[in-house]
Amino acid sequence: RRPSTLDPEALGFMCGLEIHQQLSTGKLHSRMPSKLFDIGIDEIPTDWQRRERRLRASQGESGRIDVAARFEAKRKRSFVYVQSPNSGLIELDEAPPLSHDKEAVDAALTISAMMNAKPLPYLQAMRKTVVDGSNTSGFQRTTLISTKGSIETPAGSVGIDVICLEEDSARKLDTQSTNSGEVVIYTLDRLGVPLIEIATAPDVKTPEHAKETALALGMLLRDTRMVRRGLGSIRQDLNVSLACGDRVEIKGCQDLDWIPQIIRLEMARQIHMFLLANELREEAGLPPLPSDRRDDNKPIENRVSRAAISRIPMVLHDVTNQFTNSHSTMIERSLASGSSVIATILPGFSGR
C-alpha cells in the first residue's frame, strides 16, 4: 500500500517528538560567547591552535563499558580539535566546567512556565557517554529542568515529558584517511552552546499532527526571544512505532514540511518488515509474529531465534576485491585506510 493511504489509528500508530533548540546565551558551562564561525576546513586561520586526541572507552557508573563506546573505540580514530576564539580550557577538557549559565537556566525556566511544566528543586548535571569525538571530554552534560508539561495544538493537547538543558557538540569540518588511520577534524566554536531539549509524550495522533506539534513548539520557543535562528539552530527527532513494529528514532529532521512524509515512509517500512518476517517464518514452518507486538510470546520468540541461528550459518567472507572499483567516496576512503568489506550468505532470503 502507498504510504499516503495508511490509517494511523488502525495500525496502532504512536509518535513523540524531541526538539533540540540552540539558545542565544553564553555557553552552558563556560563563560565563553556562543558565537559560530562560518568557516570550512580550508579557511581556518593560521593562528587558531590545534590539538590532537584519541578517546578510549571506560567503565561508567554501572561498572560496564557502553556497547556503542566500545565499538567507537575499536575504530581507533584520532581527532583534531581546532581552537576557535570562543573556546578555552573548558572546551579543551583541560579545566573543570563552571556552573550553569544563568541566562540559559532562565530561558529554560521561562519555557517550562509557558508549557505549565513543573521545575525540579535542584539542578544536577548528568553525563552521557559520547566517543565519536564530538565532545572532547568523551561525554555530553545534560541537566533535567522540568517535567509534566503540555502544549496546545490544533488537534489537541500534547504532553511534555521532560525539558532539559544540554551542551551542543563540536562541529565536524572534515574526515581524512591516513596511513595510521582515520582522522576527524572538529572546530570547538559550537561545543558547549546551550540546547533546550523538549521531549513530548507519545500523544501525536497522525503524521500531520506531528508537523503541527513541531510548529507549535517552534513558535513557542521563538516567542521567548532567547533562542537562535537560522539553519541548524533547531532539530526535530521523531519517535515512531506501529503495533506490529518497534519504536524507531528518526534523527535530524530540519524541514517541518518533510515530517509527515518521513513518518509515513517509516510506517510503510515497518509494515513491510512485519510482512517479510512472517513470510520467512511461514517458509520455515515457524509461528507468525502477532499483529500487536505487545502480544509477543517469549518462548515462541526464543524458538524462532534458535531456528534462525541454525538456518543462517554466519560464515564470513572477505569480498573487498569486488569493491575496488566502487564509485562511493565512503567506500574508497575506507579501503584506502585499510578497511575490508565482509559479507555473509543468508540462505532462503532470495535477495529479499
Task: Kindly label every feature range from the protein language model.
Residues 1-352:
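Basic, nucleic-acid-interacting segments
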